[in-house]
Amino acid sequence: MRLLVLGIVLSLLLSTKAAAEESPAVAPMPLYRDPVYDGAADPSLIWNPRTERWWMFYTNRRANVPDLPGVSWVHGTPIGIAESADGGTTWEYVGKAEIESPDPSIEEPTYWAPEVLRGDDGRWHMFLTVVPGVFTDWNHPRQIVHYESDDLRKWSNPRPLKLANDKVIDATLFKLPDGTWRMFYNNERDGKSIYFADSPDLDEWTDRGRAEGVGNRCEGPKVFRWRDKYWMVVDQWRGLGVFRSEDTEHWEAQPDNLLQRPGQGEDDQVQGQHADVVVSGDRAYLFYFTHPGRRGEAAQRDGAEQRRSSIQVVELQIQDGWLKCDRDEATQVELAPPAE
């Protein structure tokens, strides 16, 4: 009888251990911090079939560089790359993107908000915000530039896009059912409104004006399709605004924002900002960044602690027809390679 009981206990322990090993690990908080400048922001994720790893491209703000006046620390920024070998749970720095300047006369261009995708031609395409130099204020032109790559590391053939004006940022692209590419972006000269443009081939673009129903005073749009709806997530500096649509032309605003209330986790006790969304199977994951040092009495200071930023992740849910998430709930990330 004693042997039988021991056998049952051992069997239960082994089955519990096996189940634990099969379950995906919980993503750490923070998910990722950049080891060079400690300024990872504006994440954009893509599956790299050559390395069989998920890659994360991000704006690498120069948060830890001392004595940079004004907002010059947000300029002169490279595009960092991190990779994950375990489906998006943990990330390691693998360097920076090698980007050809659209204007060789610019000594130190600024790169922001990469949007990376695979085109119909099988090549990699990046739509990148480029600022012509390093500045201490926000009062300078910027443009969205189209790049191409064969390996996701070296980016060349820069072609600035002709959009609404000379101060546009933060492209996000989505392929419509008829094969048309639709790009949403932030028009800063029109009250930081969201505009959109269409292209049959990623090269020739027709600007379509404002996105109906989105309003203004936001940036960093991300558009994706999930559970029979089109969704747009934008950074409103009070968490993430959400909009839904049946056709990507007419948008309806969600009553409340995501990630407006601070979380409890490490580096997550502030609002969430500029996000990417990866849909994997029936699940969707929101990758966002935070400024952990901007809270309490220290929030108004301008030191390295207030400038640094971290990447976080949370799984999205749908409740009463709208997006919801619980940033304090453990997130098990399971990003599968996309279907070919």
Regions found by a protein language model. Name each.
Residues A20-E340:
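Carbohydrate-active catalytic/glycan-binding domains of CAZyme proteins
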